[in-house]
Amino acid sequence: MKQLVCTASLLLLIGCQSTDPDIRAMTKPDFADAAPPAIDSQTSSTRDIRFATYNTSLYSDDDGGLVRRLENDDASARKIAAVIQHQRPDVLLLNEFDYDANGMAADIFLKQYLGRSQDGQEAIFYPYHYIAPVNTGVQSGMDLDNNGKIGGDGRDRGNDAFGYGLHPGQYGMLVLSQFPIDLDKTRTFRNLLWKDLPGAMKPKNPATSQDWYKPADWARLRLSSKSHWDVAIETPKGIVHFLVSHPTPPVFDGPEDRNGARNHDEIKLWSEYLDNKNTQWLCDDKNICGGLPSDARFVIAGDMNSDPVDGDGVPGTMLQLLDHPRVSKYAAPRSDGAA
């Protein structure tokens, strides 16, 4: 079944508690100022449903830093909340929102920022949200940048993580929803190995024509720099699979272009997920294998760090999704400078 549309780098393609303590889908949070109003759209099957994606840059270089920022009336967070209150999407992906295992940052942002009027906008309440661990900042124990040492300080430490980051959870993701989230149908692919992707773009060292990664490292390297999530949203029109990710920028490397190759393959993963052919390799973090059923409705969203025309990415990277037969073909919203 074909679904939504797209922009370039920031992409939108439309086509309770977990048993895992690190994964949370909150329901009806205890709002600070007022009880959330009734959501008429939950009982209406005729109303349009609005999905959105937003890179918030709500991150800190320090572990727990975002929680401390939000606890101290952060000006940037208030401005971001005002934008969300003005646009009022039903389902929203926030990229670059630091993950913490207790969900404190998400709770504070929901209650103290979205749940209170910002810049004259009406407060907005999301009864459901989803957070889960990401690969950024999780040390791999490998010398992934080939500088002769494992870990270190600053960027050296970040480069040797499974996804670039200075602490686990940096640059994470957060999904907000007006509708319930079905955790049994929700999937994550944080641990999927890059080597298992068919036709993976294995980086080469151009100076030696040898593989950039040592064989033992390539065998352990994860594909997703943050994570890939299939979040099952129970809308009045039925389940919609919210396919969200934040591929690594195709820069900050060297002539081997290891980040360009990874960006290409992180985006390719969604193309393979939509194809759903010969997917015995495509196993989620619960070890359930397979792609998206052909009759499933979906939205693909995220900061893809890729453009079909410009930029530093591998040519054709975004076309893997834009030209996919399951993706709807109609004009995406646009504005000068994507503002």
What are the language-model segments listed below?
Residues 181-193:
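Flexible, glycine-/basic-rich loop-and-beta segments that form/coincide
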Residues 119, 128, 241, 248-339:
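Metal-dependent phosphoesterases centered on the DNase I-like endonuclease/exonuclease/phosphatase
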Residues 192-279:
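Metal-dependent phosphoester/phosphodiester hydrolase catalytic core
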Residues 2-7:
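Sec-dependent signal peptide recognition
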Residues 13-15:
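C-terminal motif of bacterial Sec signal peptides marking the signal peptidase cleavage site
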Residues 58-59, 99, 136, 181, ...:
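Short, solvent-exposed loop/turn segments at secondary-structure junctions
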Residues 17-175, 202-220, 236-240, 255, ...:
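N-terminal, active-site-proximal structural segment of metallo-dependent hydrolase catalytic domains
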Residues 50-53, 90-95, 128-131, 173-177, ...:
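Structural recognition of the beta-strand scaffold that forms the well-ordered cores
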